[in-house]
Amino acid sequence: MSRAARTLRIGIDARKVNDYGIGSYIRNLIEAIARRPEASHYLFRVYVPGADRGALPELPPHFEIVEEDSPGYSIAELTRFAWRLLRDRLDLFHATHYVIPPLARARAVVTIHDIIHVLYPQFLPNRLALLYARVMIRRALRRADRIITVSYNSKRDLVDYFGIGPSRIEVIYNGVAARFRADLPRAERDRVAEKYGLPRPYLLFLGGEKPHKNVRNVLRAFAEARRARALPHALVLAGPMPKNRSRVEALIAALDLSARVVRPGVVPEEDLPGLFAGADAFLYPTLYEGFGLPVAEAMACGVPVLTSSTSALQEIAGGYAYLVDPMDVDAIARGIVDLATDPARRAEFADLGKRRAADFSWDRAAEQTLRVYAEALRGAPSRPAAPDPRPE
């Protein structure tokens, strides 16, 4: 049977569906694709670890969940997963991270969210991890029929670092789920605060302890802001916590913040709107982001955002949030004081942020992604690169 005479098969790599960050992209994109009427023209095979099947919502009949337990960054994904893709006779494979297993004969679309691994190799655990990242990203960029990235900043990074032709790269912004746009009743904010033992008022940081998340400068700036104005606020540090937390815990103690810092760990998505909405401000002065989804989600919740004037954060939040140099502790502290003590400034940035968040839609991202699939399946030539709407 010819390819034209049967329903085309599209595979989506969802093995990182429960990962922090990229998991949100995978879950929301698949759910939004499933809602699109044009998706019913295809059969989808969604590859998910057996333990994570419940992370995806119930999908329509043209979606099949396939258990695939080969971990990322492993020999298994280059062998066992590769053989599975070959046997499944896919017409197109969407690599939602940056690994396109060898042997796969299907056309390929790859999403490269950012290239932090190669721009900041000091953030990787060892040189082997750096080598793997470089090799697999380069291979994916050569192999892919279409390349998706999530910001114009990431597109520029790909062009500058790897020499990729701009016309091969499609920028598709992440979306913001509907749960973040709802006006939450006070009772929901109170429920979340009680569940996690959050004192009021509080400032929120979300992101864990990876070096590029810049949590140490956030703590230093918070301590400086408290010294300057005796702020009544607590600082909530939400996100994954490593087994060995001694360095950050030692810094918290050295800054005399033990009584003012709350660490709830990973907060599930259903509680995030209440966590955001209960904060006086959201602090996200990270060193590098490919998009910065928590910034868009906080904006949608009507929370004023303090974030970085670097990487994609300038593109996503510039003009709509309080921007700072993430390496300047004094600047972060001044921003904290400004937002914590000035209700008018908070209201201004809350309104601006809500307007900006309206630009980010998972339904639009799904529509654009399906268009990329169709072009890749047709073998259509790359369209001229869209102009970057943000200045360099």
Predicted regions and their residues:
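Carbohydrate transferase catalytic cores enriched for Leloir-type hexosyltransferases
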Residues: 1-392
